[in-house]
Amino acid sequence: MQSRKTRALGKGRARVTSCDDTCATATEMVPDAKDRILASVRDYHREQESPTFVAGSTPIRPSGAVLDEDDRVALVEAALELRIAAGGNARRFESEFARFFGLRKAHLVNSGSSANLLALSSLTSPKLGEARLRPGDEVITAAVGFPTTINPAVQNGLVPVFVDVELGTYNATPDRIKAAVTERTRAIMLAHTLGNPFAADEIAEIAKEHELFLVEDNCDAVGSTYRGRLTGTFGDLTTVSFYPAHHITSGEGGCVLTGSLELARIIESLRDWGRDCWCEPGVDNTCRKRFDYHLGTLPPGYDHKYTFSHVGYNLKTTDLQAALALSQLSKISAFGSARRRNWRRLREGLSGLPGLLLPVATPHSDPSWFGFAITISADAGFTRAALVNFLESRNIGTRLLFGGNITRHPAFEQVRYRIADALTNSDIVTDRTFWVGVYPGITDQMIDYVVESIAEFVAKSS
């Protein structure tokens, strides 16, 4: 018997053409003029000098975008062609990004947080029938993380169930997830912390056993693998962020991916105002029966383009952002290699220093690291605040592990949630953990300066 979840799833001058209701204005330009402009953009890019690293003076940021000549040209070219609404670049990126993961559909949105909102909201759609999530249903998640992994549950009237994380990997473990399941549990939503995969295969099996949806927050982990398989391919839905701090960037942006055509259709509807029509922007009557529908209590033949099947949002991105994302897409592998190299150099350099718990990769994983987490030991002769302040005084950027134990924040004082087990490690993370950067813009010289600075501080403080 099928489970309820399975059942659910111009020459001489520019000539501007008219702007349709998507405002995707197009320009016809003499090719030579466009080529000259783009050549000048390349010249301009090459004239920009990369600053020489000066220890203690040049900032070492924990994260950032790495943009090259092709990225700059892609943005300018899209601007020249006045691609201002989501269009051809967006569709092409969605197709290529879905192919990268081996999934059927990808939908670009305006942020990773919006991607999380859409992913979980889609599971509440009436179109899923008895499988849909309803107010009061429970969603298991980790207590440590970024709030927008958790907020969509609250925003949909669901109940977050918090489990503790493991020190070192900073992920929730399968045994904790399994112990948290009750008759009210309907979904699991977890992030791969700082690019380090959670045990996705085992947790996916728990979800399957209990007929639960699994949503992977893959915002910090594009290119990471678990048991040889890309993170983001284990769940029913996966989300990605393209904010400049992340593995590739579109400036602002995000994406929801799925292997389910039914969920993809719901995602698209929720993203695009909740409308029932699936036409691309600027396109009408794809279904060839635009005025033949009779839905709800609307009069027969009501325009399908203005028929709404969900209480949705407008979370689309623009073609300029998609142009940058497309240019960045081919760099995922190189960026991942740089992140891994920087992480290893830090790990080797800091190994053996007293008072520091260094990060470890989840067994069977190959993380494309987002950051390098350090936890101060209980018996260290110094505090996190002292070390962080010392590093910041040397222009070495630091970050806490996002929200730490999210239940300790003012925003959650009036939120209904359940704690599945003691959040001991989550509190340790809140009190004693921080991270430094490994993104591709950090050089070996910078990594060595970070290592030297931490070693100097520990030697003086221990």
UniProtKB/Swiss-Prot annotation:
Keywords: Lyase, Pyridoxal phosphate. Pyridoxal 5'-phosphate binds at residues 112-113, 220, 241, 314. Optimum pH is 7.5. It comes from the Bacteria. Its cofactor is pyridoxal 5'-phosphate. SUPFAM superfamilies: PLP-dependent transferases. Disulfide bonds: none annotated. InterPro entries: DegT/StrS_aminotransferase, PyrdxlP-dep_Trfase, PyrdxlP-dep_Trfase_major, PyrdxlP-dep_Trfase_small. Its EC number is 4.2.1.164. Pfam families: DegT_DnrJ_EryC1. PANTHER family: DTDP-4-AMINO-4,6-DIDEOXYGALACTOSE TRANSAMINASE (PTHR30244:SF34), TRANSAMINASE (PTHR30244). Homodimer. Belongs to the DegT/DnrJ/EryC1 family. This is dTDP-4-dehydro-2,6-dideoxy-D-glucose 3-dehydratase. It comes from Saccharopolyspora spinosa.
